[in-house]
Amino acid sequence: MKDLLKFLKAQTKTEEFDAIKIALASPDMIRSWSFGEVKKPETINYRTFKPERDGLFCARIFGPVKDYECLCGKYKRLKHRGVICEKCGVEVTQTKVRRERMGHIELASPTAHIWFLKSLPSRIGLLLDMPLRDIERVLYFESYVVIEGGMTNLERRQILTEEQYLDALEEFGDEFDAKMGAEAIQALLKNMDLEAECEILREELNETNSETKRKKLTKRIKLLEAFVQSGNKPEWMILTVLPVLPPDLRPLVPLDGGRFATSDLNDLYRRVINRNNRLKRLLDLAAPDIIVRNEKRMLQEAVDALLDNGRRGRAITGSNKRPLKSLADMIKGKQGRFRQNLLGKRVDYSGRSVITVGPYLRLHQCGLPKKMALELFKPFIYGKLELRGLATTIKAAKKMVEREEAVVWDILDEVIREHPVLLNRAPTLHRLGIQAFEPVLIEGKAIQLHPLVCAAYNADFDGDQMAVHVPLTLEAQLEARALMMSTNNILSPANGEPIIVPSQDVVLGLYYMTRDCVNAKGEGMVLTGPKEAERIYRAGLASLHARVKVRITEEIRNTEGESITRTSIIDTTVGRAILWMIVPQGLPYSIVNQPLGKKAISKMLNTCYRILGLKPTVIFADQIMYTGFAYAARSGASVGIDDMVIPEAKAGIIEEAETEVAEIQEQFQSGLVTAGERYNKVIDIWAAANERVAKAMMDNLSVEDVVNRDGVVEQQVSFNSIFMMADSGARGSAAQIRQLAGMRGLMAKPDGSIIETPITANFREGLNVLQYFISTHGARKGLADTALKTANSGYLTRRLVDVAQDLVVTEDDCGTHNGIVMTPVIEGGDVKEPLRDRVLGRVTAEEVIKPGSADILVPRNTLLDEKWCDLLEENSVDSVKVRSVVSCETDFGVCANCYGRDLARGHIINKGEAVGVIAAQSIGEPGTQLTMRTFHIGGAASRAAAESSIQVKNKGSLKLSNVKFVTNAAGKLVITSRNTELKLIDEFGRTKESYKVPYGAVMAKGDGAEVQGGETVANWDPHIMPVVTEVSGFIRFADMVDGQTITRQTDELTGLSSLVVLDSAERTGSGKDLRPALKIVDAKGNDVLIPGTDMPAQYFLPGKAIVQLEDGIQIGAGDTLARIPQESSGTKDITGGLPRVADLFEARRPKEPAILAEISGIISFGKETKGKRRLVISPLDGSDAYEEMIPKWRQLNVFEGEVVERGDVVSDGPESPHDILRLRGVHAVTRYITNEVQEVYRLQGVKINDKHIEVIVRQMLRKGTIVDAGSTDFLEGEQAEMSRVKIANRKLAAEGKIEATFTRDLLGITKASLATESFISAASFQETTRVLTEAAVAGKRDELRGLKENVIVGRLIPAGTGYAYHQDRMRRKAQGEAPVVPQVSADEATANLAELLNAGFGNNKG
């Protein structure tokens, strides 16, 4: 028996491999795989059910139908193994060879492989340099192609129609050779000399100048070189032998009633064989040409359908009008081999059930129904029963378990102890969607879940179901316990904050417990400690909220672990003293001496984790939960209708609003305001009224009057249940209370526009029919949105995972000095995100210098933890250069220092961590919370849009950056630069506020000036763009001819006249070439020069500019010469939410992108064309100018003669990330994408760490375009992997040769996924056919670097615990050791493992 096992093992041995190569199969190769030719289309004999000989299921070719038994039954049993039966010709072996052995069909006529023909760009077409239409006409026997021209005037590859061919035959006879069909194409491909062709093309490439031609040549050269290097022969793209899939992979299953269910492939193969045999017969009979041709065409079509049905012409359908599933369909799409069977498999040993609350569980436990546990752990129980000698055989054990004898339950208890199970809730959006717990057996049929892990699973108990999986092997159990246990996943990988935070009841309980109340029972007592506080509370001598003095002993520990103990009498409340009893030692009392809301509790857990570590935090979290539930139950905070107090002022406010609306309506009817203005104003009025009602209501709800001990009335925070729920963060929000007790306010239509009649009622008063009807609009839209959102969000996550899946931490330090400069995110007057939050957990890229000195505050390569961040804050540092994955120099993967802290663990990241997948999940998981809609700016929003001044909020000093200004006669500054930034610095040098100052703004105070809070520092008119003069002098009109370039207009109200410059479209013939301008001259009439240049001060005026000055008037620097009216940006739609995130990651170019200056230099305008202006930028160093045509309707931000820097905005609009990368570099584009994505998430209140977005950006920047190949093998204009280019350049630099130069490319995530090095990963993502075709032609090797490829080939992934295994393999390979394959059979190994496990279980008894 042992020998037999050894033999079996030898059969199933897998070779260790490092890479997978895909290439074209040559006919000989196909024959070498084959075990015989399939000659007949028959499948099985319908009477005997035996396979027909030489048919598609033939036992002689493919192997026996039953194990170790030949077809005719002469040889049965194992002893005849390997014998070939002389009667039926079947080899006696296992039947599973029918899954492995292939057959083949010898085609009577060559056939083109449809993938290489039709998959665009057509490989055959590109190789032969013939259009696809022509090749198809040849293949499907419509025309001839010349193969050898001989001495005639016919070109090779020339297409001839039937008539032309006959004419040529008459004229030249046998001089030339022309054929039709696949034979012709095959002959053409065979005759190609690839290397010679390559040389010719390279020469052509050097000579040609046309861009399109270059592109085409490069494509052809790449393809030819791929063929040469891979050893593929072009003629192999034409099939002469067709392989036949093993029969068990295209089974034929008998159904009841004598019918059969068959795989579609059998039908397709039958067609091919039938047509092939018919063609052979016709050729033997020497049938007329036309019949043979027709048959050949039919054969070509049959082979096409087998390989890829529906790719050409109509798909071949089966009996039920459904297209047949071809070989290509088997592998592509969601139901294909890749996604259905290789990347996601079904799991045995799993169960699922509804979940319910387990409030008494510990954090690492889950309640598992006994019935389910018994089923899941059956094999373990059988083993235990046998081991104990309670059952003699497995069968007996089975019976015992089925009878559910008492001993079985005892054994189940033992088996389950210390054996973790995995719980998973679909959809698993991030890695916390599967966690491990220790099961506790419970009665009933529902799984019990610990309430604190609900946030991670996004679970609630309204009928959610969860799946249970059992890790079987020791390794799996170890990983479940060490890595996946719920107690090890306290922090969220997305932002590093605790994810095990109490919510709802628990928060309410703690909040209620820690509130204080004036004049409560027992106020003013002095207690000896928390124990006494609890005693008097239980005895009913004092209320929970009573303000008392308590003696507290606290041990305060800082992050270094030093601790000091101090005892003091503290003013606090009874409830807080009781809560202090569960707080672990080492935290200060101040942490509970406050009303605890959700934020405070989260902060408390975070502090606890940072100071005390994992174990105390877990215990503390559990205690918080138990306490919270207990006191929430005691609080009796329930909601009654009287809790929704409607403010008395409501009626008055609504009345006022209605009068205002009526007034506006009158103005509209008398024609004073436009319809649009009326609508906007009405909406503004109602929005303001709603705010006022809400404010009145909240003021009313949030405080109550009480009498204190001295009999004086004072106000205290209200104990209204609804208010407490919202205030603590347990449930509900001010906006929801507003709908209950204020007014519902304005509603939106499904298209997002606002209905102008608001709902003045609230839910307590109830809605009337009209109000209810208006409400339904929004509600239904919400439901429809949610459904769409889920699908879109899931697809975004899938693309993100796909692009980042191969990014793993592979080394400790790449040694780079590059990084990105982090500053706090400031919008207007608010610090949206302080510097501390942005740099926490990053590594410094260079020393941080103490502001105002030369001392080093933080050395280079320091991981900034909480301590360092405190130091930065104390010294008010406001920018730090930190390492980033975008600038990491590691070739494949990233280094730990560039990534920084592992957010879910709180220390620097470990090698082998799959940061790419974590990033993708962190960005994708909150996707369902983002909105789907496009916002219309209307009403309230548009008011904010047209700002006209900057008012600072805090006291401090001003700091202007990128500023140019002139001082006008009044001594004020007039800004003449485009992207000026104004910052407000406090006395510690920290940036508090930041604003953009537009061109032409007037500022009373300049750089460095002190300002008070609330002071207005800049003013401008938002509706016009001024032209500001930088010099003083007299105005001289140039080319300002009345009626030709300008026209006079008189304002009806004021009677003032002004000149308006005509648009070039409105000018008459002679005025077209004139360029109206204002020159500034001195008293003598000489040109005044612009300070610091030798250019005369003259200001060209664009069309529509308004001039209110007369010729010859004296003006001073900083005066406005002309005004250009700005069309208000109107109601532009802002794409928000999920679509915006998708657009950013797909790097889509916006519809009308901002135009950026390509080079630095001076602006001027060249000759105009009909619809466009010519913008010319002349560099200051006098090199060649850059020209660009810009449509006339685009508003330009620059005037003639202005100096711009490369990358400055010339015309406003959304910026295109590609332009930013080209003109401002990698860091600018990283910053842009990060900030824009964060903006969307910040609106929804979702926190995601920047580094996740940077990880995705790094993957988008993987490719570069070669500008100059140097001594490398790259082609100019070729897109190559950056890591490849860098490696090649390093090698060349070492040899002292010319390195390649390149520009970085930004690819969208879908494109980047498809352009990955690994063809297996790309094929399993999208466009499987195209990817595989391309890879096969190039003979690509997949190095199996990423996670996906390794999952697909069935290996451990090179990340996490599999990282060590792969490193070990690499090391052995480098040392040239043979792979260690244990010479044990599978059965032996299982037996050994069972012994080990059982031994382990046996010892547990004691």
Curated annotation (Swiss-Prot):
Q: Per its UniProt record, what Pfam families does this chain match?
A: RNA_pol_Rpb1_1 (PF04997), RNA_pol_Rpb1_2 (PF00623), RNA_pol_Rpb1_3 (PF04983), RNA_pol_Rpb1_4 (PF05000), RNA_pol_Rpb1_5 (PF04998)
Could you tell me the EC number(s) of this protein? Answer: 2.7.7.6
What the record notes about the co-factor is: Binds 1 Mg(2+) ion per subunit.
Cofactor(s) recorded for this entry are: Mg(2+); Zn(2+)
Substrates-to-products reaction catalysed: RNA(n) + a ribonucleoside 5'-triphosphate = RNA(n+1) + diphosphate
InterPro entries named in the record: DNA-dir_RpoC_beta_prime, DNA-dir_RpoC_beta_prime_bact, RNA_pol_asu, RNA_pol_N, RNA_pol_Rpb1_1, RNA_pol_Rpb1_3, RNA_pol_Rpb1_3_sf, RNA_pol_Rpb1_4
Which GO CC annotations does the UniProt entry carry? DNA-directed RNA polymerase complex
Q: Is Transmembrane helix found in the keyword set?
A: no
Task: Describe the family membership recorded for this protein in Swiss-Prot or TrEMBL.
Answer: Belongs to the RNA polymerase beta' chain family.
What is this protein's record name?
DNA-directed RNA polymerase subunit beta'
Q: Whose protein is this, by species? A: Yersinia pestis
Gene symbol of the encoding locus: rpoC
